[in-house]
Regions:
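A short linear hydrophobic-aromatic micro-motif
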Residues: 31-37, 71-72
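Short amphipathic alpha-helix segments
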Residues: 13-31
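Small/polar loops that bind or transfer phosphate-bearing groups
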Residues: 10-13, 51
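C-terminal structural segments of small proteins and small subunits
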Residues: 50-78
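Short, flexible, solvent-exposed loop/turn segments with mixed acidic/basic and small polar residues
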Residues: 1-2, 34-40
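Short, charge-patterned binding micro-sites
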Residues: 39-47
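Short glycine-/aliphatic-rich beta-strand segments at the starts of folded cytosolic domains
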Residues: 2-11
Length: 78
């Protein structure tokens, strides 16, 4: 079993926003991947962006530039 690590988890209001996040991150080479929302978090959309904690500032800047609004930003074991 893979050991859980503390990660940055960004949730979204819609699946469209989660998919947009995936597209812009892939295009820009940003850290992270789409995951199902962890059971410890409640969100409107069932998908979340998971990345290393150190990537938080860069990802938030990218989201502002691309007008993607997060529902929540968490640091949790994933």
């Amino acid at each position: 079993m893979i050991k859980k690590q503390e990660r940055l988890v960004i949730t979204f209001y819609t699946t469209t926003a989660a998919m947009a996040m995936e597209n812009i991150c892939k295009a820009s080479g940003a850290d992270g991947r789409i995951i199902p929302v962890p059971s410890s978090i409640t969100a409107d959309c069932g998908l979340a962006w998971c990345a290393k904690n150190e990537s938080e500032d860069a990802l938030l800047d990218l989201m502002v530039q691309c007008s993607i609004t997060p529902q929540g930003i968490y640091h949790c074991l994933v």
